[in-house]
Amino acid sequence: MEARAIARYVRISPRKARLVLNLIRGKHVDEALAILKFTPKKASKIVEKVLKSAIANAENNHNMNRDNLYVAKAVADEGPTMKRVLPRAMGRADIMRRRTSHITIVVKEKEE
């Protein structure tokens, strides 16, 4: 049995979100929350919120025991990119890309 939580259109680059997700993949949920709490990255707050949602989904919707939960899957997929114009010298303009992510976390119960 698995429970999942998805945060879509999050205003953080998928590349930066993956740095944080790689830290928690395969870990027990309580250990993962502890890691996220002390990780000094913007993405860690967002990932922590999604992980807490996945844990709540597991407990409330699937009657799973929190003590046996671990992070089975943690991915950051690319969302739509917002393009903005950045004025430069001599009448030129650059495109600034504001990237978004879809963050998915799946938790499963450890098999005894």
From Swiss-Prot:
PROSITE patterns reported in the protein's UniProt record: RIBOSOMAL_L22
Family classification: Belongs to the universal ribosomal protein uL22 family.
Primary role: This protein binds specifically to 23S rRNA; its binding is stimulated by other ribosomal proteins, e.g. L4, L17, and L20. It is important during the early stages of 50S assembly. It makes multiple contacts with different domains of the 23S rRNA in the assembled 50S subunit and ribosome.
Biological process terms in GO annotation: translation
Protein name (record): Large ribosomal subunit protein uL22
Protein species of origin: Caldanaerobacter subterraneus subsp. tengcongensis (strain DSM 15242 / JCM 11007 / NBRC 100824 / MB4)
Gene3D superfamilies, alphabetized: Ribosomal protein L22/L17
GO cellular component, one term: cytosolic large ribosomal subunit
Top-level taxon of the source organism: Bacteria
Keyword tags: Ribonucleoprotein, Ribosomal protein, RNA-binding, rRNA-binding
InterPro entries: Ribosomal_uL22, Ribosomal_uL22_bac/chlpt-type, Ribosomal_uL22_bac/org-type, Ribosomal_uL22_CS, Ribosomal_uL22_sf
GO molecular function: rRNA binding; structural constituent of ribosome
CDD domains in the record: Ribosomal_L22
